[in-house]
């Protein structure tokens, strides 16, 4: 399996594996918004670019600005709905080569407050099994 190939990509294939991990909330301007089913971080979302792009630097200025506008739009909604103290942004693509941002709300007294968010063991094992 070559995760940099769109035919092996979780987001491009939009298959059962993806829908077991996340709920698609809405299409955005140039991306798709997902809510993780695993909610250690209440409100944790993911914004995935609409096309199979490996890195933010592969986008034109216009595409990058539109993608980041989608990310900001989501975080503003998260602030209104969940009222977290902070939102962690994660852009990891060494295991899944499709441009996406993890958005993890952080709450004082909640998991990993004051540090970076981490997937819990259930979430990590679930992703390993499915990808």
What feature does the model see in each segment?
Residues 1-128:
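HIT superfamily nucleotide-processing domains
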């Amino acid at each position: 399996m070559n995760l940099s190939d769109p035919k092996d990509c979780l987001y491009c294939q939009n298959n059962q594996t993806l829908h077991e991990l996340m709920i698609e909330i809405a299409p955005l301007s140039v991306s798709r918004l997902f809510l993780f089913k695993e909610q250690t971080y209440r409100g944790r979302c993911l914004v995935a670019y609409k096309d199979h792009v490996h890195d933010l630097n592969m986008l034109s200025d216009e595409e990058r600005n539109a993608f980041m506008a989608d990310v900001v739009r989501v975080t503003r909604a998260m602030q209104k709905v969940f009222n977290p103290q902070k939102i962690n942004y994660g852009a990891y693509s060494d295991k899944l080569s499709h441009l996406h941002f993890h958005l993890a709300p952080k709450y004082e007294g909640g998991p990993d407050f004051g540090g970076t968010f981490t997937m819990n063991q259930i979430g990590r094992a679930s992703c390993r099994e499915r990808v």
